[in-house]
Design a protein with these regions (language model features):
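Structural core segment of the AMP-binding/adenylate-forming
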Residues: 154, 158-248, 390-391
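AMP-binding/adenylate-forming catalytic core of the ANL superfamily
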Residues: 166-192, 206, 380, 387, ...
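Conserved ATP/PPi-binding loop(s) of AMP-dependent carboxylate-activating enzymes
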Residues: 474, 478, 489-493, 504-539, ...
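Conserved beta-loop-beta connector loops within the AMP-binding
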Residues: 490, 495-518, 555-559, 622-630, ...
Length: 707
């Protein structure tokens, strides 16, 4: 069964390069045109509707209240996301094209064509239906980077179940929160995962996460690590009547499935991101708008658009085009190195590459197993053209190969595009990757976006003059000079501003707040079961103007290029993973050694930032040595949240500095640890705590002298 012929929309825009999308009408028309990238069963009746927050007056405590923002795109339109990502490519005669190149950490490999992927998704969809999963039900997927993760993700999209992927490195407690918060009916997990040459048990975490009160009816278990070992297979913990092996569920299922049609505004997935209150926020993304902007930005940033000849006689992609260049699609092998649970992978490792019909690589393990050249081997083996990764990973490769890989040892000749995501990249890492993996000529897209925006907001373009051979463009041409660590400008169809707390523009070079003042279709619609938190987190400050507050600091140069400066709230960005300081503090104070905790970010050459914990101690804690305390508390955080959240250091202090309203001054804690000037401390209720902490840091050799 195929969808009807795509509805023919009127093209409201003149297809010229670099369109000025200044008006709301032009912006909406642009996204209507880009929506033609997808196959729709029924057209929409309303392209876009945005109800900005409006003041509702003041409550009894004098706090201004606002209405909840409402964001809609392509209302009335019907489609199937999985059909758009897989089936339509098969129907177009491209079923034999490889969709996924999978490489496991132990070295096992598999090439899965679009036709085979379609078959496996159908069997998984039928399996979910046999367990009673229906449209709107939530399915939590707790799997490593393996084909089954993508298969179940698209099976959920196919039947209209809402998927929520959870990072395999998260603890049972973190998984349990997501299982309970989503009200999931099914949890999909694995017996174990391969990590740094070892098999790490996973099913035990899943079982712990399902303890207590929840809505879990079934746990599907993928046999990843014990299939060849009957003893290990039999030792996997099991709950009869609830647990089912993946192969037992799907082997006898039909390999075809008559998919359903879904409204453009039906929820597609829930993705959790840390917030300043400690409790992760479940952001809801919807089917139509998310897939439209994902399809377009993937095509724009990874060079799939058709070219035109510019005024300098150079081929450049037509940024307005709603179709891709077939030859570019066929020649692309895309690799986004993110874990599939992160939004980076949702957009540019699952949905983006597949909706555009390219081949992509997924790799299960760590980049240094069994050696630091593993990623280089993967690039060479599959002929990777696009390598999209995180600054932390680049810095780790720099540490292993300061002067680059041994000349001639690896073939990087296929690499034509590099990308960075998750945090600001330092210029040294930018230059190192471009020189040693990109041959000094590859385009480098330094992307800025968030879980909330769903897809890239700001980025250089692959064919910017900066990446053309020297002399191609006249001096003074916009974007002619490479700017390492610069997100440059917004992609077409959205726009940003850098403003002060009053919403006024800041001077070039001065730090302000970056806001998205014209949103695109992939913007999150709400926080799961908590629309008030959606308002308070993102829209309260500038919402009446229709501006989304991203929570990042930024600055612009004289030419309007955007530089992202990091978080303005109490979230730590560690290797591109956003973690709440309060969430870490909450874990620390559950340990019997700790009375109170204050956690702050400090700069780190490898991961960008790390967490440092200041703690006041109980008598039990005071009986521990410094090393014993650090070991106990880092292990405790690892168990409660996950390894990524463990503090780099633990400092025992007599008191935690706070404002007069009782808020921990995390900024000051970070400045103290890094030996920096504190500035104004007049708002503190216990200023003397600063002097004590400064002396502790000196006495323990952490800083050379007190500030």
């Amino acid at each position: 069964m195929g969808l009807p012929t795509p509805y023919s929309f009127t093209d409201p825009l003149n297809p010229t390069p670099n369109p000025a999308l200044e008006s709301d009408e032009a912006r909406v028309a642009f996204w209507e045109k880009q929506a033609q990238r997808l196959t729709w069963a029924e057209p929409w009746h309303t392209a876009h509707r945005f109800e900005k927050p409006k003041s509702l007056g003041f409550d009894e405590e004098g706090i201004e209240q606002f209405s909840i923002p409402e964001i809609k795109w392509f209302e009335g339109g019907k489609l199937n996301v999985a059909y758009n990502c897989v089936d339509r490519h098969v129907e177009a005669g491209r079923g034999d094209k490889v969709a996924l190149y999978f490489e496991g950490e132990p070295g096992d490999r598999e090439a899965i064509t679009y036709a085979e992927l379609q078959r496996r998704i159908a069997k998984a969809a039928n399996g979910l239906l046999s367990l009673g999963v229906r449209k709107g039900d939530r399915v939590v997927i707790y799997l490593p980077v393996i084909p089954e993760t993508i298969i179940f993700t698209l099976a959920c999209a196919r039947i209209g179940a809402i998927h929520s992927l959870v990072f395999g490195g998260f603890s049972a407690e973190a998984l349990k929160f997501r299982v309970e918060d989503t009200g999931a009916k099914v949890l999909i997990t694995t017996d174990g995962q391969n990590r740094r040459g070892k098999v790490v048990p996973v099913k035990v975490n899943a079982d712990e996460a399902c303890s207590g009160e929840n809505n879990i009816e079934h746990v599907i278990v993928v046999d990843r690590t014990s299939a060849s070992d009957p003893v290990a297979h039999a030792a996997v913990p099991w709950t009869e009547g609830r647990d089912v092996w993946y192969h037992d569920l799907v082997d006898d299922q039909p390999d075809t499935h008559a998919y359903e049609l879904h409204d453009a505004e039906d929820p597609l997935f829930i993705i959790y991101t840390s917030g300043t209150t400690g409790k992760p926020k479940g952001l809801v993304h919807t089917m139509g708008g998310y897939l439209v902007q994902t399809a377009y930005t993937h095509a724009l940033l990874y060079d799939l658009l058709p070219d035109y000849v510019d005024e300098n006689g150079v081929l450049r992609p037509d940024e307005l085009s709603a179709v891709n260049d077939p030859e570019k699609v066929e020649s692309t092998v895309h690799w986004c190195t993110a874990d599939l649970a992160w939004v980076t992978a949702h957009t540019y490792e699952i949905y983006g590459p597949l909706v555009n019909g390219v081949s992509e690589v997924i790799y299960e393990g760590t980049p240094n197993t069994p050696h630091y050249g593993r990623h280089f081997e993967v690039i060479e083996r599959y002929g990777v053209t696009n390598y999209y990764t995180a600054p932390t990973l680049i810095r780790s490769l720099m540490g292993a190969f300061p002067d680059g890989p041994e000349p001639g040892k690896y073939d990087f000749s296929t690499v034509r595009l590099l990308g960075s995501v998750g945090e600001s990249i330092n210029p040294e890492a930018w230059r190192w990757l471009r020189q040693h993996v990109g041959g000094g000529t590859a385009a480098f897209i330094d992307t800025w976006w968030q879980s909330e925006t769903g897809s890239t907001v700001c980025s250089p373009r692959p064919h910017d003059p900066a990446f053309a051979p020297e002399g191609t463009y006249p001096e003074g041409t916009p974007h002619c000079t490479p700017l390492p660590g610069c997100a440059t400008r917004a992609v077409p169809g959205v726009s940003t501003r850098v403003v002060d707390e009053h919403g006024d523009p800041v001077e070039p070079g001065k730090q302000g707040f970056i806001v998205v003042d014209k949103i695109g279709p992939s913007m999150a619609r709400t926080v799961w079961q908590n629309p008030q938190r959606f308002l308070d987190s993102y829209w309260r400050h500038y919402g009446e103007r229709g501006w989304f507050l991203a929570g990042d600091g930024a600055k612009e140069d004289e030419e309007g290029n955007v530089y992202i400066l990091g978080r303005i709230d109490d979230v730590i960005n560690i290797s591109g993973h956003r973690l709440s300081t309060i969430e870490i503090e909450s874990a620390l104070v559950t340990h019997p050694a700790v009375v109170e905790a204050g956690v702050c970010p400090v700069e780190d050459d490898l991961t960008g930032h790390q967490a440092v914990a200041y703690v006041t101690l109980t008598d039990e804690g005071k009986a521990l040595t410094e090393d014993e305390l650090k070991a106990a508390l880092t292990a405790h955080v690892r168990e409660h949240i996950g390894p990524i959240a463990k503090p780099k250091d633990v400092v025992a202090v007599a008191d935690i500095p706070k404002t007069r309203s009782g808020k921990i001054t995390r900024r000051l804690l970070g400045e103290l640890y890094q030996g920096r000037s504190l500035g104004d401390v007049s708002s503190l209720q216990n200023e003397e705590a600063l002097g004590h902490i400064a002396q502790v840091l000196v006495d323990t050799g952490r800083v050379s002298e007190a500030v």
